[in-house]
């Protein structure tokens, strides 16, 4: 039997907010260091995909953990600081736009997830992965949880770390590549971003040339 489990769950069984039940169940089985793993940035036209792995202690006092997309910027930033201070271990990995183009976004995301689990200072005994896919060659058993950032506090913590990290990277990119509004839309295909690409063209190393929308703009310029 495979030690990796893909857990496709009914969306109607989502808890009101993420909880520690998956982690406690695994700890009762002898897996004490549970890493929650999540990604941010699969869909944007520009910038990296960023992943984070977070191991929380079971007596953590983080209040209001949830899927990063459901939090205000202020609350997300507060929780980000609290996670950095209280987590047993945190690891972050990113794959740049060029590398995404050389592979594909799914493979790049899984590779970034693998790297951040491998990079944990406290080795994970088990990994809870947000989504349907489990990265290959992990150093520990793993389970994939659909909507995991709404089920597991460890995955929710990872989603916050990945989101804040990527947003800050894109804010910096906005200072370097002015005129694209990256600090506002962080690379997503907003009307303003598409208009800027149409006017200035895509940027090598920033935009994902393997994405259909960028390909179309490139062909129009050519």
From Swiss-Prot:
Entry keywords, A to Z: Cytoplasm, Endonuclease, Hydrolase, Manganese, Metal-binding, Nuclease
Main location: cytoplasm
GO BP, sorted A to Z: DNA replication, removal of RNA primer; mismatch repair
Superkingdom field: Bacteria
Reaction it catalyzes: Endonucleolytic cleavage to 5'-phosphomonoester
Coiled-coil regions listed in the entry: none
Molecular function terms from GO: manganese ion binding; RNA binding; RNA-DNA hybrid ribonuclease activity
Enzyme Commission identifier(s): 3.1.26.4
NCBIfam families on file: PRK00015.1-3
Function per UniProt: Endonuclease that specifically degrades the RNA of RNA-DNA hybrids.
Family statement drawn from the similarity comment of this UniProt entry: Belongs to the RNase HII family.
Name used for this protein in its record: Ribonuclease HII
Source organism of this protein record: Bartonella bacilliformis (strain ATCC 35685 / KC583 / Herrer 020/F12,63)
């Amino acid at each position: 039997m495979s030690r990796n489990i893909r857990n496709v769950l009914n969306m109607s069984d989502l808890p009101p907010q993420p909880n520690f039940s998956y982690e406690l169940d695994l700890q009762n089985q002898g897996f004490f260091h549970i890493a929650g793993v999540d990604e941010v940035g699969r869909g944007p036209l520009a910038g990296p995909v960023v992943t984070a792995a977070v191991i929380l202690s079971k007596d953590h006092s983080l209040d209001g953990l949830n899927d990063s997309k459901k939090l205000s910027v202020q609350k997300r930033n507060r929780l980000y600081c609290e996670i950095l201070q209280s987590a047993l271990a945190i690891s972050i990995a990113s794959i740049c736009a060029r590398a995404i183009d050389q592979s594909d976004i799914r493979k790049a995301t899984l590779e970034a997830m693998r790297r951040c689990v491998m990079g944990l200072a406290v080795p994970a005994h088990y990994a809870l992965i947000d989504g349907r896919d489990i990265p290959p060659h992990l150093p520990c058993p793993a389970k994939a949880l659909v909507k995991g950032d709404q089920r597991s506090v460890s995955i929710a913590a990872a989603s916050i770390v990945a989101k804040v990290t990527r947003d800050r990277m894109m804010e910096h990119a906005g200072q370097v590549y002015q005129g694209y509004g990256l600090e506002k839309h962080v690379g997503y295909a907003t009307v303003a971003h598409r208009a800027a690409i149409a006017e200035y063209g895509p940027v090598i190393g920033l935009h994902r040339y393997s994405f259909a929308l960028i390909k179309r703009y490139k062909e129009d310029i050519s």
